Amino acid sequence: MLSLSIATPGTAAIFRRGTASATSTSSSFHGVRIQHQVSARVPAAATISSSSPKPSVVMMSKREAELKEIRSKTTEQLQEEVVDLKGELFMLRLQKSARNEFKSSDFRRMKKQVARMLTVKREREIKEGIKKRLSRKLDRQWKKSIVPRPPPSLKKLQEEEAAEEAAEAAKSA
């Protein structure tokens, strides 16, 4: 714990290079005295920190489980999922621009998922000995080979609309 006290002009001590201490009252700066006080009490931060590691351990295990799940997938599955997630990001941007309701936290979550998957993909390439330049070349080829398709959420929305139309057609017939 620090305490700060302002010294009076008569007790101010100004330290210069050549001397250990010299007292001067001609300066307008009166000096600042900093004292360290040791208290016998246990600070509140110490008691809180002892209980806080439990949630962080849970978060770590959740992240580990997610990474284990990502690493268990093949590279092709990862690429397919990256395409799907990027399509979902596009749909979120579309909802945002149309001023529809959406969760803003989904942007960050999806971007992080894409980054994790691409990181695992790059880790595998490094393990196989693929250099950075060749990796970029392969990525360009992969991106050119992607067939545009609607994201899963849009597919589900289209299926729901088709089911509603079929139900309405059945009612009117």
From Swiss-Prot:
It holds the Pfam family Ribosomal_L29. It is found in: Plastid, Chloroplast. Its main location: plastid. One of its GO terms (cellular component) is chloroplast. Keywords: Chloroplast, Phosphoprotein, Plastid, Ribonucleoprotein, Ribosomal protein, Transit peptide. Residues 143-173 are annotated as: Disordered. InterPro entries: Ribosomal_protein_uL29, Ribosomal_uL29, Ribosomal_uL29_sf. The keyword Phosphoprotein applies. SUPFAM superfamilies: Ribosomal protein L29 (L29p) (SSF46561). Residues 1-60 form a transit peptide. GO terms for molecular function: structural constituent of ribosome. The modification Phosphoserine is found at residue 172. GO terms for biological process: translation. Belongs to the universal ribosomal protein uL29 family. NCBIfam families: L29 (TIGR00012). Part of the 50S ribosomal subunit. This is Large ribosomal subunit protein uL29c. It comes from Arabidopsis thaliana (Mouse-ear cress). The lineage of its organism: Eukaryota, Viridiplantae, Streptophyta, Embryophyta, Tracheophyta. The gene is RPL29.
